[in-house]
Amino acid sequence: MPLAKRIIPCLDIRDGRVVKNVQFHLNTWDAGDPVALAAEYDRQGADEIVFLDINASWEGRSATLDVLSRAAEQVFVPLTIGGGVSAVEHVKAYLRAGADKVSVNTAAVQRPDLIDEIADLFGSSTLVVAIDCKRRPEGGWEVYLHGGRTPTGIDAVAWAEEAARRGAGELLVTSMDADGTRQGYDIALHQALADAVGVPVIASGGAGSPEDILEVLTVGRADAALAASIFHSGRHTVGEVKAFLRERGVLVRS
């Protein structure tokens, strides 16, 4: 029996507030309190919730524990936290504070052995490797670090393969070109990832409608859809998106 597709609201946090950027850097707007929003999305039927401290890696610090611990008291779906995770000690602290999974991005590229260490100590099921990438003019996608500020020259699909091989339980892959545009996911990117790796892929960047989410879960073959603007704006609820998918034959949890 196929696994249910997951709908995952993403809360980008800066200075204790949920914000939303466009293509990682333009037109930031304040979407509210992270704990209140997480609790609301839990009520709406979210399968999981992701907290990303979007400036943590650039500022050389780890993500806030306060938001996580408060959310864990009020939210009853799995929580993932990321942003500035660069050591096993960070992972241990987040799991103790209530996280179910920890997302690692920049530090994993800089020191790939970190993936092996986390997977060995805590299990692959706790580890999400996040990949931010941008289309190359010559084809393919390039990995960027530090919240999209630093190009690496690394091919995103090749890095996804290595991360999965080293022990990532899931991959959270964001198209920087599509991020915040509400113009749809980069379907070709997610098709390429589905062909390349055997671990679940969470698609991120570009959701503007239930149709966009349907497309990335079916045509793009993603295992889960991460979305922010579509929910923060109030245009759609998680429940509405799930009902839309269910009516079109996509298996989702109630």
Swiss-Prot record:
Subunit-level organization: Heterodimer of HisH and HisF.
Originating species: Symbiobacterium thermophilum (strain DSM 24528 / JCM 14929 / IAM 14863 / T)
UniProt keyword Iron, yes or no: no
Catalysis: reaction(s): 5-[(5-phospho-1-deoxy-D-ribulos-1-ylimino)methylamino]-1-(5-phospho-beta-D-ribosyl)imidazole-4-carboxamide + L-glutamine = D-erythro-1-(imidazol-4-yl)glycerol 3-phosphate + 5-amino-1-(5-phospho-beta-D-ribosyl)imidazole-4-carboxamide + L-glutamate + H(+)
Gene3D superfamilies: Aldolase class I (3.20.20.70)
A biological process term (GO) from this entry: L-histidine biosynthetic process
Any single GO CC term annotated in Swiss-Prot or TrEMBL for this entry: cytoplasm
CDD domains to which the protein is assigned, alphabetical: HisF
TM region(s), chain numbering: none
Pathway note: Amino-acid biosynthesis; L-histidine biosynthesis; L-histidine from 5-phospho-alpha-D-ribose 1-diphosphate: step 5/9
Example GO molecular function: imidazoleglycerol-phosphate synthase activity
One Pfam family, short name: His_biosynth
Reported function: IGPS catalyzes the conversion of PRFAR and glutamine to IGP, AICAR and glutamate. The HisF subunit catalyzes the cyclization activity that produces IGP and AICAR from PRFAR using the ammonia provided by the HisH subunit.
Family: Belongs to the HisA/HisF family.
EC number in record: 4.3.2.10
Gene: hisF
Active site as annotated: 12, 132
Domain of life: Bacteria
InterPro entries: Aldolase_TIM, His_biosynth, HisF, IGPS_HisA/HisF, RibuloseP-bd_barrel
Location in or out of the cell: Cytoplasm
Name of this protein: Imidazole glycerol phosphate synthase subunit HisF
